[in-house]
Amino acid sequence: MSQALNFFVSSSSRSPATFTISRPSVFPSTGSLRLLVKKSLRTLVVEASSAAASDLDEPQSSPVLVSENGSGGVLSSATQEYGRNAAPGTDSSSIEVDTVTEAELKENGFRSTRRTKLICTIGPATCGFEQLERLAEGGMNVARINMCHGTREWHRMVIERLRRLNEEKGFAVAIMMDTEGSEIHMGDLGGASSAKAEDGEIWNFTVRSFDPPLPERTVTVNYDGFAEDVKVGDELLVDGGMVRFEVIEKIGPDVKCLCTDPGLLLPRANLTFWRDGKLVRERNAMLPTISSKDWLDIDFGIAEGVDFIAVSFVKSAEVIKHLKSYIQARARDSDISVIAKIESIDSLKNLEEIIQASDGAMVARGDLGAQIPLEQVPSEQQKIVQICRQLNRPVIVASQLLESMIEYPIPTRAEVADVSEAVRQRGDALMLSGESAMGQFPEKALTVLRSVSLRIERMWREQKRHEVIELPSIASSFSDSISEEICNSAAKMANNLEVDALFVYTKNGHMASLLSRCRPDCPIFAFTTTTSVRRRLNLQWGLMPFRLSFSDDMESNLNKTFSLLKARGMIKSGDLIIAVSDMLQSIQVMNVP
């Protein structure tokens, strides 16, 4: 079967001429591709018309419902997600842009804007409003709250401060909530922020409960069968091997352990135990991925309107699918995305299926490195990043990026090289954990991520300019292939023509995500009518998300956008722009008037 590719060339002196070229169809039978060259406007327009549904259909609104028992049995009304749509009374002629993005663009120009996104875990060191503001000013795109630590009341306070920060200071910081997961981990250390385990010390790991403070050199464990499952001679790894113990004696619910590798014990650190050089996995495999506490935390996240829920220790795609159905049932118009944390052998065994089912993935290298040989972690990281790129899922590289900066004001050179490699692999985002949650230098750590990202991105663009990045087709994942073809073509045109920016007008973010996947040389200005979509796009590589009211009239949208951005000094007359849209499924090339 073949399908026509029509070229319409118009000028002011005569009627359009039409050229028809038959070729094997790359589009569904419901659509066609038109290339229009408007000489008088210096505008090249490529349009693909299709009967496929546009992603601009308005979702049906419904109240947010949460489970009171964490299992979905009893439902009650909860607070509507904040900022899902434009606030009532918002001026339709205005445009909302992150203040840091605007400043970066004005200061550095199109080519030198940062493309890699930055995530900060919020903890005692960064939970104040002024501290959050400094992180946002330093380039934080997403704030992460970890339900392993703190109470829901504390996390609600942080979320409220982040909302206030966005509303009052002009930021678009998204919120990501991590579930605790059902893996075996330590308790809270009796309220202490940390404890130092020295070489040769004897520590007691127990399932008994104690009122603070804990007895000296005692650690509680969350798994009741811990003392029964471990054996004398087993090796116990804390927090991915940051501290190591050898089991030397079992006395009822207590397990006596000898410290063989000293280090810092942190509250609720993950525990794994090895026997004869192999990870003991049987007990962990029997634990559910999402615990009863996790379900209550998820209900909390839905009620508070978080943008992302990151699921710990995902074992299969079915877990992700179940959670997405759960969220949809309780908030039908919810924009919450589900991120799969890849941090176990089970995750690696079902990697592609898990990523396909999710809305993104996190390479949690710390816990992953506790279950596979250390030398295997870099290759697995690269594999995960590549699969996410192929399947058009944002990917976060996390854990121990700048671990030394928890205590020191500058990173090791090896850490800088590690960050550089993550940027070079073109992951969407880098994440700080303990560095920002409890470290002494959270702002400096963020500055390091930002500066290294900028340098490596600039170097990569200079070395790889005009290089065509071939990606496998993902059209089978969507209802049609037109959007993918348009975005691939637009990105290649942008590189070849050395345009200043790509504009994309999108309701649900799909077209913007496809453009981000192509990793073009220029920045991508993503315009959406929905505040929650704007925040969600803040996770993806190269996207500068704006909230803007627009119509189906692309000429009107472009004129309006040009006027608003020129008034803010973000673009100027003569800048070369390529614009795509999911309304008309078109490509337009033009100079800013």
Curated annotation (Swiss-Prot):
Tissue: Highest levels in roots. Also found in stems, leaves and flowers.
Residues where substrate binds: 144, 366-367, 399
Cofactor(s) listed in the protein's UniProt record: Mg(2+); K(+)
Record-listed K(+) binding positions: 146, 178-179
Keywords: ATP-binding, Chloroplast, Glycolysis, Kinase, Magnesium, Metal-binding, Nucleotide-binding, Plastid, Potassium, Pyruvate, Transferase, Transit peptide
Annotated compartments: Plastid, Chloroplast
Gene Ontology CC entries for this record: chloroplast stroma; cytoplasm
Single GO MF annotation: potassium ion binding
First-listed, main subcellular location of the protein, grouped into a coarse class: plastid
Pathway: Carbohydrate degradation; glycolysis; pyruvate from D-glyceraldehyde 3-phosphate: step 5/5
Positions annotated to bind Mg(2+): 343, 367
EC number(s) recorded for this UniProt protein: 2.7.1.40
Reactions mediated catalytically: pyruvate + ATP = phosphoenolpyruvate + ADP + H(+)
Site, Transition state stabilizer: residue positions: 341
Residues noted as binding ATP in the record, renumbered to the chain: 146-149
GO biological process entries: glycolytic process
Enzyme class: transferase
Region Disordered: start-end pairs: 57-94
Similarity comment: Belongs to the pyruvate kinase family.
NCBIfam families the UniProt entry points to: pyruv_kin
Listed name of the protein: Pyruvate kinase isozyme A, chloroplastic
Protein's organism: Nicotiana tabacum
